[in-house]
């Protein structure tokens, strides 16, 4: 009887021990599984926007196809022109005034020659503010010149811009262009470069170019207004 009691006692201990040993792993596995879920490599792998951003930046830094054949010295210029064309806002150009410098043109001469100062015209362009806040523009438009002939022009302009207020900006710079006039080279297109200035307010801007010259030609302040459309 004593042997049976001892045997039963030992068997009972073994059963209790075995139950404890089998019941404890689930809690361990749950905690371990939770820790695995929290620190699993899958979660860290999901932080892939960095990889996507790097891929996008790689794509953004890819050389435009049109710049592939440019000399390395001029490739930055090509990249900037491509950026203005692809990322810039579309600008509507409205031309309206050309002031003949009264210090080189007398009032009598202006009356005699009947110089036109209402330089009506218009066209389209692209405008872009770079990472420093300076403005780059591509444009093509036509207007009535001093003799009321239609003068086409196309070019690139750059303005170093200062922020006067949040919405109001002003800039100074230059423009390189190609134009054609019947009184100069008989309408054969020729290049030129002129100083530019501009003021910006929201989507509106007024830009002016001074065309140097002599007492019989040039010395004209040309003014054009632009409106920028949303992309």
Curated annotation (Swiss-Prot):
GO cellular component: cell outer membrane
Annotated Gene3D superfamilies: 2.40.160.20
Segments of skewed composition (Low complexity): 24-43
Major enzyme class: transferase
Residues in the signal sequence: 1-23
Pfam families listed in its UniProt record: PagP
The entry's keywords: Acyltransferase, Cell outer membrane, Membrane, Signal, Transferase
Chain segments carrying region Disordered: 24-59
Catalytic site: 100, 145, 146
Family of the protein in this entry: Belongs to the lipid A palmitoyltransferase family.
Functional description taken from the UniProt entry: Transfers a fatty acid residue from the sn-1 position of a phospholipid to the N-linked hydroxyfatty acid chain on the proximal unit of lipid A or its precursors.
Subunit structure: Homodimer.
Protein name as annotated: Lipid A acyltransferase PagP
Protein's organism: Legionella longbeachae serogroup 1 (strain NSW150)
